[in-house]
Amino acid sequence: MARLSGVDLPREKRMEIALTYIYGIGRTRSKEILDATGVSPDLRSKDLSDEDLAKLREYIEESLKVEGDLRREVQADIRRKIEIGCYQGLRHRRGLPVRGQRTKTNARTRKGPKRTIAGKKKAK
């Protein structure tokens, strides 16, 4: 099984898809990586040679932030916004949507399960 950046790549998938299993690499970046290293996107990860794997590993390590480093950077950015007290930081602190979405209805993913308010009755 091919292993890149601490992630086991699925054996049966094409490299173009298999690379997207690494946090921080999507389809577009996957294509860029394969073009830069000269590895065929149609090659299955089980068919990768050691030399192809080394090329991919070297390219990803030297030019991209992925997995743990990227997760830490994102968390640090969120912490910084909370500390400086900007609007986005306040929204993060309150557990509400950060990017201007409506909250009167919807936003349940961010707000969590619905909490019923005691003593509120419908008018007849």
Curated annotation (Swiss-Prot):
Q: Superkingdom, according to UniProt?
A: Bacteria
Any Pfam family matching the protein: Ribosomal_S13
Q: Which residues form a coiled coil?
A: none
- GO biological process annotations for this chain's record? translation
Which InterPro entries has this protein been placed in? Answer: Rbsml_uS13_C, Ribosomal_uS13, Ribosomal_uS13-like_H2TH, Ribosomal_uS13_bac-type, Ribosomal_uS13_CS
Identify the stretch(es) annotated as Disordered: 95-124
Molecular function in Gene Ontology: rRNA binding; structural constituent of ribosome; tRNA binding
User: Could you tell me what this protein does?
Assistant: Located at the top of the head of the 30S subunit, it contacts several helices of the 16S rRNA. In the 70S ribosome it contacts the 23S rRNA (bridge B1a) and protein L5 of the 50S subunit (bridge B1b), connecting the 2 subunits; these bridges are implicated in subunit movement. Contacts the tRNAs in the A and P-sites.
Q: Which PANTHER family does UniProt cross-reference here?
A: 30S RIBOSOMAL PROTEIN S13/40S RIBOSOMAL PROTEIN S18, SMALL RIBOSOMAL SUBUNIT PROTEIN US13M
Task: Return the NCBIfam families for the record.
Answer: uS13_bact (TIGR03631)
What is the official name of this protein in its record?
Small ribosomal subunit protein uS13
